[in-house]
């Protein structure tokens, strides 16, 4: 494998600002060809805690300005006032960044009662349904365990941990922590634990989202067509999403359940911020609407514009993607060999391609720079049993 020495400060001066601040990025980086270039021309070579939060190097001009605007909207703490964002009346997070810290995953500090710090389980999402998947009356798909002042949350989450010790075949022991969740303080009828299916999820990283949205659908469908390996117990299929009269390939979120980056849904479902796609409050018809009115909330206008949401969409599409690290390390190379020996690559595909025209944002802006790229996501975009 050929190694190229790249002097970063000559090409990416804005990146060095983070390097100097944290001291964890390198000025000289070994840049291998091939699979280490995770996202084609959008690959960067940063290793600090901010590595997920930089724009791709091909971004410039008005697109770079909009990226910065979207970054601000992504991280800004929203409040309940119409001027500052329309948070609530109930919500699960107070900004995109409260769940996706620096465009990555937040590590929650879980308390046994009340969740994570003063904001409850603000870095996790709690999905509640009946055992058959149906929603409960008076509740939606997400438990909103937070609310603005004077409004009652939908419920509170508590957790109890059970630590268990196991053993690898070679005798080395390891410990796993099993959480058991309990929901209390239901605002309406209490739901019995035996009737409840509760899924507590850590939000996903937002790195590589633009490349994912630009993937060639035909390539994913071809993977599904050949993804049948009975000798390994593996099969996969595409997940198609029908919404507003259009059927599209699901790519994003848990189990490929969305065909876009769900910016509008995130504003609505997670923060209670109404928009053109979801104009109703998430607690529509619940007592929290009246409680919010008593606290001075007005529901006669949308809380965020489509233009602002598209700036957030652009920010997520145009993030740079860190390269694979330590690709020449013998231990890493041994792990890669085991990856193939275990047939992980049959599902977590190592190489994919983006379509010619790139990606289109939620309000019609096109990003052709995401097109015609060879990427190495090591990701699985199919559904499996």
Please give the residue ranges for each predicted region.
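Sec-dependent bacterial lipoprotein signal peptides
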Residues: 1-17
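Bacterial Sec-dependent N-terminal signal peptides
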Residues: 15-45
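Surface-exposed intrinsically disordered loops and tails
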Residues: 43-44, 184-185, 356-385
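Extracytoplasmic redox metalloprotein regions
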Residues: 45-47, 52-66, 76-309
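The canonical Cys-X-X-Cys-His
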Residues: 70, 91-103, 206, 312, ...
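Secretory-pathway/luminal and periplasmic proteins that interact with or process carbohydrate-rich
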Residues: 80-82, 98-110, 321-323, 342-346, ...
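His/Cys-centered metal/cofactor-coordination and adjacent catalytic loops
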Residues: 313-325
